[in-house]
Amino acid sequence: MMAENNLKMLKIQQCVVANKLPRNRPYVCNICFKHFETPSKLARHYLIHTGQKPFECDVCHKTFRQLVHLERHQLTHSLPFKCSICQRHFKNLKTFVKHQQLHNETYQNNVKQVRRLLEAKQEKSMYGVYNTFTTEERWALHPCSKSDPMYSMKRRKNIHACTICGKMFPSQSKLDRHVLIHTGQRPFKCVLCTKSFRQSTHLKIHQLTHSEERPFQCCFCQKGFKIQSKLLKHKQIHTRNKAFRALLLKKRRTESCPMPNKLNANQGGFENGEIGESEENNPLDVHSIYIVPFQCPKCEKCFESEQILNEHSCFPARGGKIPSRFKRSYNYKTIVKKILAKLKRARTKKLDNFQSEKKVFKKSFLRNYDLISGEQSSEQTQRTFVSSLGKHGTYKTTGNRKKKTLTLPFSWQNMGKNLKGILTTENILSIDNSVNKKDLSICGSSGEEFFNNCEVLQCGFSVPRENIRTRHKICPCDKCEKVFPSISKLKRHYLIHTGQRPFGCNICGKSFRQSAHLKRHEQTHNEKSPYASLCQVEFGNFNNLSNHPDNNVNYNASQQCQAPGVQKYEVSESDQMSGVKAESQDFIPGSTGCLPNVLLESEQSNPFCSYSEHQEKNDVFLYRCSVCAKSFRSPSKLERHYLIHAGQKPFECSVCGKTFRQAPHWKRHQLTHFKERPQGKVVCLRFG
């Protein structure tokens, strides 16, 4: 019945094509305006626009738009057509017929090839072979026996062919292993990583990757390998060497010792000594000789070639001689020139205060310290440091005393830990960049003249490396693995990850992560800028004041009007009665956030001024916190500040329950929950 219906449909289509009758399509889709012949086709077309698929498969629950598509899909679950040769299933009759034709073609081609071979071998004249063989296996492998037609027929019976791809195999086990490729099965599974393999040998090789065992060991250099093929490749390195091959082919003397050859400590290469020949082992057997081809005399490491051994050099011990090829690279003057060039580049790029210069010294100079300078005692270091400073210091007369001012770069103040042993124990610069108990003020300059002196460089940096490696980096961050010198800085860093900004401005409501940032921001709301030097030029930022060209401002600790919190330091030389004074180039803001209460002086202005004038300006801060000693202008700000110590946040959001310390923060947060619609209605985002 199905065949008859198909023939009728074909005849109708042929008649329509031959006569080219015009089709009448009165039914139009009101969405895409397509025309259809029948209402059923129009209804089926509407399913495309609605997205409905009414026909569902019972097995896999797939849906289809037409019944024909469902019937075609159901054939994939049943696969009614089965091949009797390779046991494969097909859902379509056409593909099944094509598949059977392939089997017939391969079978016919194989039969034709076998017949041609038999005819060609039978035509050849066979003569008697009188060769004798020691074993039956060698006789079976002889080519004359293979040319026998009776032998070839027996051989052909034992050939196992694959029914899928037609490949031939000598045994059934190999054929079964080959069939796994077509089926996709991997029966051998690893217990540790659940990887599967087709052969057991592959699984055993894979299991070696999980263990640290190296069963295959090189007999020359005792290096272990997990796979035998890698061991064979490694042995080619030994046999490829000319000196190694010469040793193998050379006649051994029985008088020489059987141990490995001696190594000369004065030479860097391998000394080819004579190796004794054992009575049991064959002298030409490579595996019976224990040879280390190229070995370093100091660290006793083995290398595969002489070139690698020449490139390798052990670091010379302290006080030892430097090789001639390293003398040029570790020249003392070239290192100082490189340091100065990098420092100039760092200044032009305007990097941070001292960290850039410190990194330059750390990477370029201290790396080569062991080759340049040996150990020095602390007394020698102090003498060389004071004598070198005497060449580059400047004298200044103040009253009846003649004082000497050191010209130190500002970055050396922060490297106080490296300057231990240079000054006496009373005058050592502390780690927190402050000075202890003596009149030692610091004035800044470019520092190029100071760095040109090699003695100062050698003395200033001839300290143990432990001071640099273990420089108070104790507290690491568990999120980004950054290291900080103190817990307070780590807590301040955690605010970046949490997103908190606890310090808010009362005027504009901006929030900041640090109190110093808030204080700097509050100066933008003031009418007058607080930071002004003696030239009466106002600045909006503290950094702009420090970069001012006329800013020759010094901390003066020798005046009578001593500001609170400033310490006196003095370093006296044995030759003179004058003290050594170091004056700072830049300001260091105090913990209170305002300008330090120190006396400012300039070389061009009057050095005598009263401290009371500066104190009158700061008398505005009347209300002081009893916990942290911070001062405020009004009691309301002091009360708000006390909330930080108490940990209270009185303003709570009614939507999400978050608490805030200030009302502007709470109002600004509430805007995140509400938004305006175009009609002017305000809708809460949480409750819709």
Curated annotation (Swiss-Prot):
Give one Pfam family.
Answer: zf-C2H2
PROSITE patterns the record matches: ZINC_FINGER_C2H2_1, ZINC_FINGER_C2H2_2
Q: Which Gene3D superfamilies match?
A: Classic Zinc Finger
Task: Tell me which SMART domains the record gives.
Answer: ZnF_C2H2
Disulfide bridge positions per record: none
Question: Where in or outside the cell is it found?
Answer: Nucleus
> Where would you say this protein principally sits, based on its record?
nucleus
Where are the zinc-finger regions (C2H2-type) in this chain? Answer: 27-49, 55-77, 81-103, 160-182, 188-210, 216-238, 294-318, 475-497, 503-525, 623-645, 651-673
GO-annotated molecular function: DNA-binding transcription activator activity, RNA polymerase II-specific; RNA polymerase II cis-regulatory region sequence-specific DNA binding; zinc ion binding
Q: Where is this cross-link: Glycyl lysine isopeptide (Lys-Gly) (interchain with G-Cter in SUMO2)?
A: K11, K112, K121, K146, K262, K420, K437, K681
Question: Which Gene Ontology CC terms are recorded?
Answer: nucleus
InterPro entries named in the record = Znf_C2H2_sf (IPR036236), Znf_C2H2_type (IPR013087)
Question: Per UniProt, which keywords does this protein have?
Answer: DNA-binding, Isopeptide bond, Metal-binding, Nucleus, Repeat, Transcription, Transcription regulation, Ubl conjugation, Zinc, Zinc-finger
What is the similarity comment for this entry? Belongs to the krueppel C2H2-type zinc-finger protein family.
| Role noted for this protein | May be involved in transcriptional regulation.
Protein name, per record: Zinc finger protein 770
Tell me the organism.
Pongo abelii (Sumatran orangutan)
Q: What is the phylogenetic placement of the source species in the record?
A: Eukaryota, Metazoa, Chordata, Craniata, Vertebrata
